[in-house]
């Protein structure tokens, strides 16, 4: 799961009450579908800092609430407002995540791209800009071995 650290970084999650926050504002159907269909209670996910000096994986979170309507889409004063989404027919989904740990070092995008074992990782393939991307069990274990 990607976020810009200037907007919401791993330290922001760490400092939240119960170190938990809803992951709102996702406005891409593919990413929404992953949150709705694939992310399950107890799943561990990487926290990735994007659009910063050193983009990379900085931590781990746990899904503590499965997909439910993203209420930021219903609020006209919210930057994620979507007039075509309403509580009766929500268009957007969010999950709640809990801080698990900050990695001992950032595993940079540049480094991830150098490993043949990660050639199929969506993040390292050209044109993949989704804020949420799948990671296989093998990829997960390999990335953790880099820490």
Locations of the language-model features?
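Aromatic- and Lys/Arg-enriched surface recognition patch
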Residues: 59-130
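Compositionally biased, charged N-terminal/linker segments
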Residues: 1-41, 139-140, 147
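Hydrophobic/aromatic beta-strand segments within beta-rich folds
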Residues: 43-46, 95-97
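Hydrophobic beta-strand signal
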Residues: 46-47, 62
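Short, charged beta-turn/beta-strand-edge "cap" motif at the junction between a beta-strand
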Residues: 48-55
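A short secondary-structure junction signal
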Residues: 11-13, 73-74, 108-110, 143-146
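Structured loops at beta-to-helix junctions and adjacent beta-edge loops in soluble globular domains
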Residues: 2-4, 48, 100, 127, ...
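Charged phosphate-binding loop/patch that engages nucleotide di/tri-phosphates or the phosphate backbone
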Residues: 129-147
């Amino acid at each position: 799961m990607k976020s810009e650290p200037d907007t919401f970084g791993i330290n922001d999650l760490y400092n939240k009450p119960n170190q938990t926050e809803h992951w709102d504002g996702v406005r891409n159907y593919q990413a929404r579908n992953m949150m709705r269909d694939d992310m399950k209670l107890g799943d561990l996910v990487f926290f990735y800092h994007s659009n910063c000096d050193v983009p990379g994986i900085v931590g781990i979170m746990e899904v503590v609430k499965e997909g439910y309507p993203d209420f930021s889409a219903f609020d006209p004063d919210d930057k994620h407002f979507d007039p075509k989404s309403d509580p009766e027919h929500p268009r957007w989904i969010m999950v709640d995540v809990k801080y698990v740990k900050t990695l001992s070092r950032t595993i940079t995008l540049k480094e991830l791209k150098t490993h043949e074992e990660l050639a199929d990782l969506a993040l390292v393939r050209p044109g993949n800009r989704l804020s949420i991307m799948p990671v296989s069990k093998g990829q997960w274990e390999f990335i953790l071995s880099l820490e």
